[in-house]
Amino acid sequence: MNEPTRRAFIFGTATVAAAGLLLGVQRILSSAFADSDDPASGPVKIAQFAPAGTPTGFATLPKVRKTPAAWKSQLTPVEYEVTRQAGTERAFTGALDKQYAPGLYRCVDCDNALFDSQTKFDSGTGWPSFYQPIAPENVREKTTVYFGTLLREVKCTLCDAHLGHVFPDGPKPTGLRYCMNSAALHFFPHS
C-alpha cells in the first residue's frame, strides 16, 4: 500500500469509528436521561381558557391520538414535520415571531391553550419566545439529547406535539425562554 492510500484508509477508518462512538454515546445518553413520566396515554389534566384568555377551570381529557396519515391530512407539511417529527423551522421564517397583539397561542394539532401574549417577548432568536406557559399543566418538558447536548423539549400535554425547547436565559420573572416554532402554534386574538 502506498503512503497516500494508507493514510486515507487510516483516516477513513478513524472517522467511521468516531462517528459510531458518537452515535453510541448519544443513544446511551438519550436512554439515561429519558423522562420516566412520559404519559403514553391519557387521561391528562389541562387548564382550559375562554377566547378572552380567562381561565374556565380544569378538565381531565383523553390524550389526542391519531395515525400518521390522519395527522398528515390535518396539518400542512411544515406543521407535520415540526409537531409530529420534532422538526425546527428556520429562524425568522415563522409567521408568529413578530406577533404581539393580545391573544392566546394554541396548539396547531389539538387546540390546547399553551401561551398568552402577555408572556411573549422579543428574544432576537427568530422564534416566538415566552417566559412561561399559560398553565404548567398544558405543556410538559422532556429531556432529549441532540448531538451530545442535553435539551429540554417542550411538548403539548394533550397531544404530545413538539412545540420547541426551553432555555434558562429568559427574562424575569422566570428566567426561562420557551423558544417555540410558529408552525406549532395558532394565534387567536382576544375577543
Role assignments for model-derived ranges:
Residues M1-G20:
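N-terminal secretory signal peptides and thylakoid transit peptides that target proteins
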Residues A50, K63-K66, K72, V82-R106, ...:
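A short Gly-Trp-Pro
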Residues L23-A69, S73:
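C-terminal segment of N-terminal export signals and the immediately downstream linker at the start
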